[in-house]
């Protein structure tokens, strides 16, 4: 068991977070969370559902840069998958932000992202990068809010166009770059 799995303390969620976000325990995912995470993502369109194996690997190999939001009843209602870029370790790449419909509207996604950035393993991160589809306004609001909390700039550029996805019906993906992070949230 990793030392960070034993903590039952509540996360330090910014005062800007609604009280309803406080009911969730934010923690690194565990290997046995893989199936619940897979189920959660399947219930969060338009997110791309990856294989259960991929979520198990994220729980096992990238727990230090991923987070789950667990309800008092033990249900996983939120998940963020992220990793440090191997060639630029001061950049956190966020792969997916999943928040179940029953937990939306409470800035849980932003709280989970902030929780990852506050971990000791991510204190050196100066930029966050992620991709979003052009019509995903909820994700854009989440990342803009995080940038505002941290006094950071958001830039956008093309990343993957629809041709990169082969014959799949997939929108273009734009790269959002947030940073530099110069101070903790207010």
UniProtKB/Swiss-Prot annotation:
EC number(s) from the headed UniProt entry: 2.3.1.178
Broad enzyme group: transferase
GO BP: any one term: ectoine biosynthetic process
GO terms, molecular function: diaminobutyrate acetyltransferase activity
Pathway: Amine and polyamine biosynthesis; ectoine biosynthesis; L-ectoine from L-aspartate 4-semialdehyde: step 2/3
Cysteines paired by S-S bonds: none
Record-annotated N-acetyltransferase domain positions: 24-179
Keywords: Acyltransferase, Transferase
Keyword Transferase included in the entry's annotation: yes
Protein family (similarity comment): Belongs to the acetyltransferase family. EctA subfamily.
Name recorded for this polypeptide: L-2,4-diaminobutyric acid acetyltransferase
Name of the gene this protein is made from: ectA
